[in-house]
């Protein structure tokens, strides 16, 4: 199981010991998209969804998702997050909504999982609030776009054209 930090020498899952690591500023940015019917997109854009302010509720859900990541992902460390910024971008061409989340902490381990969880929970909330009018929505392209800090240094995803 060489290279997989969540397994010990015997192949058993364990939480990685980060006690000896240096505390640094950690930042992760993740992104994802939900595609939908034009009529569903219009309801969100125009603020006319039956359940209320879809993106406002999804923003709060995404923040809560980042904060609760360690409760959902068994081997994640509980972290004291210093910032969770959630942005939704309406995309007429899809039609759909992009969710971009930046998570920050000052600690011994990264916040990539918190950023990914926040994106997923935000997009799942959009789905939940609109499923009565569009059960065919698709959540797609969820990924870490950038991470900063820590021993491994900074990393940025390269967009690969079709």
Swiss-Prot record:
It comes from Burkholderia cenocepacia (strain ATCC BAA-245 / DSM 16553 / LMG 16656 / NCTC 13227 / J2315 / CF5610) (Burkholderia cepacia (strain J2315)). This is Cyclic pyranopterin monophosphate synthase. It catalyses: (8S)-3',8-cyclo-7,8-dihydroguanosine 5'-triphosphate = cyclic pyranopterin phosphate + diphosphate. The active site is at residue 128. Catalyzes the conversion of (8S)-3',8-cyclo-7,8-dihydroguanosine 5'-triphosphate to cyclic pyranopterin monophosphate (cPMP). SUPFAM superfamilies: Molybdenum cofactor biosynthesis protein C, MoaC. InterPro entries: MoaC, MoaC_bact/euk, MoaC_sf, MoCo_biosynth_MoaA/MoaC, Mopterin_CF_biosynth-C_dom. The keyword Lyase applies. Keywords: Lyase, Molybdenum cofactor biosynthesis. Belongs to the MoaC family. NCBIfam families: moaC, PRK09364.1. One of its GO terms (biological process) is Mo-molybdopterin cofactor biosynthetic process. GO terms for molecular function: cyclic pyranopterin monophosphate synthase activity. Its EC number is 4.6.1.17. Substrate binds at residues 75-77, 113-114. Pfam families: MoaC.
